[in-house]
């Protein structure tokens, strides 16, 4: 029966190879429009086949879902985890293909992140597997999309059942029935990273105009594909529904200096930013469901009914008797009943997996309500939702509580609240507009957040030593993407440290250029780390690096982090939470790094929190350490860290969608169009703004080449474009194609595209050129004083051949170098015979492309003789001394060739 139902789907008839070839074309396409075209073609063909296949059927549930769940595997919620990552896949491939464990191909798979210099695919396991599998696989697979999904379902369910033997069996079926190209995409689907270069929002928008919004309120791919199968039919009501996970509303990073403006100079709410797990609760009588911010179902942990789970039995009776249905949004926290305090997420527990005999208990801290008794509240103001929230349940301390808020009006009240949060060791504060409505998956639509680490000068920083490294993958393939850092054991007086204890792994905070430069600086010192024979100077916990560096060859990095938390993974017994590299301490020697004693002192200073200063505003004030009167040695500028600042786009009204789903990074503007103006205009046309370019950034806009722009150009990862291109787009209200005069720098793929479309001077091969464009092209051509017209002859001949102009009569002598017998003494220019017919022939030769010379030398191809034959013997004597022999012809060869519009056979005119 199941097989019969399966055969009634489109997916059971569409070859998996067709999907893979489409994905391959999408990935290889440069522009967004071309990527969309390939996806749309596949989608349209699916829909046409679907309509024909189900022509006379009613209530059809078959949809695009089987393909969509493979195209967007990161959004998959129905299928359980595969339990497979790159290393596990490598071991399975080695076993299933019976590869020699120490063989070249096995080592390639196991060490996929280590650069080899062959294909440049370091860090991309799927590509490396492709080259290993290519000689061992079918040319074309036989699996359908339905069969692939069935096998992936089998892998997921057997992983849950811990049946490794059945996992191998399913993988063997995939390997033996699919090509290397198909397996490349299968691997990416299993790892849930397709690297298509196109966002899920773009895929959704092509599928249906309502798809993004429906997915935001359901996080259900199957529901999106089934309800929106017909692109011409929209949904009248797209809103949060009971027992469907929605994407929660998010907060943007706030700039304290602009807080009053961001809140439109009206009163606002301040709440504590809780350090737990964002969770939504759906309730219908005795039935409960819990979903994380990413739509994962945690009902089994927290309880589907009043008789089960770590939370539901304790809160069920807290709800008012008239509350049958509700949807709540809040933070799941771990509560210590002995100390009556909430635990921070960095400590050793996982709220989603707490066991019953734990000393901690689950507490749900609620800050919003989206539905009560079937009444949807998403379009109500936050003030109204708060009023309703207070009437839904009776708070139970340590089990279910309402997040307390205070009403504020000024920046100083925000500063006081932030300083209080620092004193209480809290994560930060939230700022919310009372009139804001709930917008799923939207960031900064009336909600803002402030954490101490967002504000420069409030955090203690650590100077620690790099002792190990990890090869990157994806865009960081082939370079060190993360570093293992350590602190020193305090040495005896007068000596340098010799033993280092690992503390943390860090990789964020660096640009690609900085990572590359740092890796280059240390490149010659890296050594493979052997777990069985580790270096005596570096003591590790369970976290081991892939390569290590002798401390004396390394550098110190300055690290900023939120706090120091316990950890068994590092030798120090603790690690850093949210670490990022601030800078490389070139001013310090390797032995001047932090010691274990320094670390313990810092750890005990504020219960591990690294925010130990208060925020002050005005005059020469600066962040001050709590309970200390001495000012810090170095002044620190107060404000949001520059690269985290985002433009204030709250008052921007969208006027066009030409930049929809396009990400820009504006580095600088022009005098007439400064950076903020360009960013506002981009937002008006539907674009996104980032302050640092990433893998999804379409291009970097630069009005001048400052140091940041030069670094981006050096990285060769991004296209850098003049603001003039943006202004042209704004003027025409269209996505104007790039032209050479718009470009400051082109990444390799763009250069390749332009080479196919334009010549080296920027003139298009295919698009008609107007007068202004031609003037612009000519103005960019540098004058060359070195080349004479004669020296240009070879270049002109090549051009004529390329464009098939070489058959023109005006080009017939182009490749000939001719000496005419115009001189009484050969090569003596003072003996020229004036007024002869040969002088006219010289002009005719030049007109028809020949190079006419006045000196008989190596390289001459023809000598032309007139009526006077007295110097023929001299010419023949000259010819015997030349490596390349020239021909001596009658002048009639020129006349006859011109008269007949083609070169005549030379042998008839030889002398």
Swiss-Prot record:
Its EC number is 6.5.1.1. GO terms for molecular function: ATP binding; DNA binding; DNA ligase (ATP) activity; metal ion binding. GO terms for biological process: cell division; DNA biosynthetic process; double-strand break repair via classical nonhomologous end joining; immunoglobulin V(D)J recombination; nucleotide-excision repair, DNA gap filling. Residues 610-620 are annotated as: Required for catalytic activity. ATP binds at residues 271-274, 278, 331, 345, 367, 427, 432, 449, 451. GO terms for cellular component: DNA ligase IV complex; DNA-dependent protein kinase-DNA ligase 4 complex; nonhomologous end joining complex. Mg(2+) 2 binds at residue 427. SUPFAM superfamilies: ATP-dependent DNA ligase DNA-binding domain, BRCT domain, DNA ligase/mRNA capping enzyme, catalytic domain, Nucleic acid-binding proteins. It catalyses: ATP + (deoxyribonucleotide)n-3'-hydroxyl + 5'-phospho-(deoxyribonucleotide)m = (deoxyribonucleotide)n+m + AMP + diphosphate. It is found in: Nucleus. Keywords: ATP-binding, Cell cycle, Cell division, DNA damage, DNA recombination, DNA repair, Ligase, Magnesium, Metal-binding, Nucleotide-binding, Nucleus, Repeat. Residues 654-743, 808-911 form the BRCT domain. Its cofactor is Mg(2+). Pfam families: BRCT (PF00533), DNA_ligase_A_C (PF04679), DNA_ligase_A_M (PF01068), DNA_ligase_A_N (PF04675), DNA_ligase_IV (PF11411). Mg(2+) 1 binds at residue 331. The active site is at 273 (n6-amp-lysine intermediate). Belongs to the ATP-dependent DNA ligase family. NCBIfam families: dnl1 (TIGR00574). DNA ligase involved in DNA non-homologous end joining (NHEJ); required for double-strand break (DSB) repair and V(D)J recombination. Catalyzes the NHEJ ligation step of the broken DNA during DSB repair by resealing the DNA breaks after the gap filling is completed. Joins single-strand breaks in a double-stranded polydeoxynucleotide in an ATP-dependent reaction. LIG4 is mechanistically flexible: it can ligate nicks as well as compatible DNA overhangs alone, while in the presence of XRCC4, it can ligate ends with 2-nucleotides (nt) microhomology and 1-nt gaps. Interacts with XRCC4; the LIG4-XRCC4 subcomplex has a 1:2 stoichiometry and XRCC4 is required for LIG4 stability. Component of the core long-range non-homologous end joining (NHEJ) complex (also named DNA-PK complex) composed of PRKDC, LIG4, XRCC4, XRCC6/Ku70, XRCC5/Ku86 and NHEJ1/XLF. Additional component of the NHEJ complex includes PAXX. Following autophosphorylation, PRKDC dissociates from DNA, leading to formation of the short-range NHEJ complex, composed of LIG4, XRCC4, XRCC6/Ku70, XRCC5/Ku86 and NHEJ1/XLF. Interacts with DCLRE1C; the interaction is direct. Interacts with APLF. This is DNA ligase 4. It comes from Pongo abelii. The lineage of its organism: Eukaryota, Metazoa, Chordata, Craniata, Vertebrata. The gene is LIG4.
């Amino acid at each position: 029966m199941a097989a019969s139902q399966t055969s009634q789907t489109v997916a059971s008839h569409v070859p998996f190879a067709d999907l893979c070839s489409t994905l391959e074309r999408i990935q290889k396409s440069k522009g967004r429009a071309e990527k969309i075209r390939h996806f749309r073609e596949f989608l349209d063909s699916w829909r046409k086949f679907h309509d024909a296949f189900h022509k006379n059927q009613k209530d059809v549930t078959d949809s695009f879902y089987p393909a969509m769940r493979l195209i967007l595997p990161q959004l998959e919620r129905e299928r359980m985890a595969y339990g497979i990552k790159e290393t596990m896949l490598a071991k399975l491939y080695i076993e299933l293909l019976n590869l020699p464990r120490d063989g070249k191909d096995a080592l390639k798979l196991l060490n996929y992140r280590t650069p080899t210099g062959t294909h440049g695919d370091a860090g991309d396991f799927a590509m490396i597997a492709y080259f290993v599998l290519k000689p061992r696989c079918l040319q074309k697979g036989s699996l359908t999309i339905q069969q692939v999904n069935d096998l992936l379902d089998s892998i997921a369910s057997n992983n849950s059942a811990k049946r490794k033997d059945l996992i191998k069996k399913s993988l063997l079926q995939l390997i033996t029935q699919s090509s290397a190209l198909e397996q490349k995409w299968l691997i990416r689907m299993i790892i849930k990273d397709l690297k298509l270069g196109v966002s899920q929002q773009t895929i959704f928008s092509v599928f249906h105009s309502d798809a993004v919004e429906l997915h935001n309120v359901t996080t259900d791919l199957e529901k999106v594909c089934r309800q929106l199968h017909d692109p011409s039919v929209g949904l009248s009501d797209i809103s949060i529904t009971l027992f469907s996970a929605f994407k929660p509303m998010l907060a943007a990073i706030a700039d304290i200096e602009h807080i009053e403006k961001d809140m439109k100079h009206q009163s606002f709410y301040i709440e504590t930013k809780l350090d737990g797990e964002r969770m939504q609760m759906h309730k219908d009588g005795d039935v409960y469901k819990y979903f994380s911010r990413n739509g994962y179902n945690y009902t089994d942990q927290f309880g589907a009914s009043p008789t089960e789970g770590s939370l539901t039995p304790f809160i069920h009776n807290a709800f008012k008797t008239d509350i049958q249905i509700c949807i709540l949004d809040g933070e799941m926290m771990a509560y210590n009943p002995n100390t009556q305090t909430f635990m921070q997420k960095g400590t050793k527990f996982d709220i989603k997996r707490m066991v019953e005999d734990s000393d901690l208990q689950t507490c749900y801290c609620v800050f919003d309500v989206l539905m009560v008794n079937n009444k949807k509240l998403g379009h109500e103001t936050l003030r109204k939702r708060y009023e309703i929230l207070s009437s839904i349940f009776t708070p139970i301390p340590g089990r279910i509580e309402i997040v307390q808020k205070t009403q504020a009006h000024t920046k100083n009240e925000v500063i006081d609240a932030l300083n209080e949060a620092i004193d209480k060791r809290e994560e930060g504060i939230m700022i919310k507009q009372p009139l804001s409505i709930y917008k799923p998956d939207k960031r900064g639509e009336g909600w803002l957040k402030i954490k101490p680490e967002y504000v420069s000068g409030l955090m203690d920083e650590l100077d620690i030593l790099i002792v190990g490294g990890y090869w990157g993958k994806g865009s960081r393939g082939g370079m060190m993407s993360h570093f293992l850092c350590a602190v020193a054991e305090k040495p005896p007086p007068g000596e340098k440290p010799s033993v280092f204890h690992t503390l943390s792994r860090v990789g964020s905070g660096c640009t690609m250029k900085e990572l590359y430069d740092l890796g280059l600086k240390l490149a010659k010192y890296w050594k493979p780390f052997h777990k069985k024979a580790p270096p005596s100077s570096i003591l590790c916990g369970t976290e081991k690096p892939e390569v290590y560096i002798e401390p004396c060859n390394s550098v110190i990095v300055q690290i900023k982090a939120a706090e120091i938390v316990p950890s068994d993974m590092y030798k120090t017994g603790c690690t850093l939470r949210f670490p990022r590299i601030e800078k490389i301490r070139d001013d310090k020697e390797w032995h001047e790094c932090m010691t274990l004693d320094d670390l313990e002192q810092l750890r005990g200073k504020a219960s591990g929190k690294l925010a130990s200063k208060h925020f002050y505003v005005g005059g020469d004030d600066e962040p001050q350490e709590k309970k200390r009167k001495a000012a810090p040695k170095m002044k620190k500028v107060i404000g949001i860290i520059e690269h985290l600042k985002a433009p204030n786009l709250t008052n921007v009204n969208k006027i066009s969608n030409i930049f929809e789903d396009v990400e820009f990074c504006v580095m600088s503007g022009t005098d007439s169009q400064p950076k903020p103006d360009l960013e506002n205009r981009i937002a008006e046309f539907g674009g996104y703004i980032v302050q640092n370019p990433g893998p999804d950034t379409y291009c970097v806009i630069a009005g001048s080449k400052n140091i940041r722009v030069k670094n981006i150009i050096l990285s060769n990862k991004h296209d850098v474009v003049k603001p003039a291109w943006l202004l042209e787009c704004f003027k025409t209200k269209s996505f104007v194609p790039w032209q050479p005069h718009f470009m400051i720098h082109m990444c390799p793929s763009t250069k390749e595209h332009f080479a196919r479309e334009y010549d080296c001077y920027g003139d298009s091969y295919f698009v008609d050129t107007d007068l202004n464009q031609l003037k612009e092209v000519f103005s960019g051509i540098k004058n060359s004083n070195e080349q004479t017209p004669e020296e240009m002859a070879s270049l002109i001949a090549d051009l004529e051949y390329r464009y098939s102009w070489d058959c023109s009569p005006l080009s017939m002598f182009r490749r000939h170098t001719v000496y005419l017998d115009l001189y009484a003494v050969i090569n003596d220019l003072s003996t020229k015979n004036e007024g002869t017919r040969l002088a006219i022939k010289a002009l005719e030769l030049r007109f028809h492309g020949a190079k006419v010379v006045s000196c008989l030398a190596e390289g001459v191809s023809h000598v032309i003789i007139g009526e006077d034959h007295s110097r023929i013997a001299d010419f023949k004597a000259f010819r015997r001394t030349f490596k390349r022999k020239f021909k001596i012809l009658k002048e009639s060869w020129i006349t006859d060739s011109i008269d007949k519009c083609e070169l005549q056979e030379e042998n008839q005119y030889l002398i």
